Amino acid sequence: MKKTMLTGKLHQARVTHAELNYEGSCAIDQDLLEQAGILEYEQIEIYNIENGARFSTYAITGERGSKMISVNGAAARLAAVGDRVIICTYASLNAAEIVNHKPSLVYLDAQNNIVRTSKDVPVQVA
């Protein structure tokens, strides 16, 4: 049996552009894509912290070093410039793959600079 597991995450990314008339997708700074292990044209899930919207699209490469997070096409109706979003990727893994699996977690500041990276989500305490 396969389980769907988190593989990459950009946490609290800030939307820098919302381009309604662009073809679709989400353009992400190439440095951020690489740190999170997200591939160009890979399906991504975007969770908007500001309004609760959750939607799927695909990643395209944004200019390296630009700190760009550009939500494009119809999805631009679900995110505004300045919104904090969480961008995730997932994969279906079998039991043997899950044993050693660790996601690539990238935590960002308000300017989309990398604050830290991790392979583990901290334990939530009461």
From Swiss-Prot:
Location(s) in or outside the cell: Cytoplasm
Modification after translation (UniProt): Is synthesized initially as an inactive proenzyme, which is activated by self-cleavage at a specific serine bond to produce a beta-subunit with a hydroxyl group at its C-terminus and an alpha-subunit with a pyruvoyl group at its N-terminus.
Molecular function (Gene Ontology), one example: aspartate 1-decarboxylase activity
Record's keyword annotation contains Nucleus: no
Residues reported to bind substrate: 57, 73-75
Record EC number: 4.1.1.11
Domain of life: Bacteria
Residues modified as Pyruvic acid (Ser): 25
Identification of the protein by name: Aspartate 1-decarboxylase
Taxonomic source organism: Psychromonas ingrahamii (strain DSM 17664 / CCUG 51855 / 37)
Lineage: Bacteria, Pseudomonadati, Pseudomonadota, Gammaproteobacteria, Alteromonadales
Gene name tied to this protein: panD
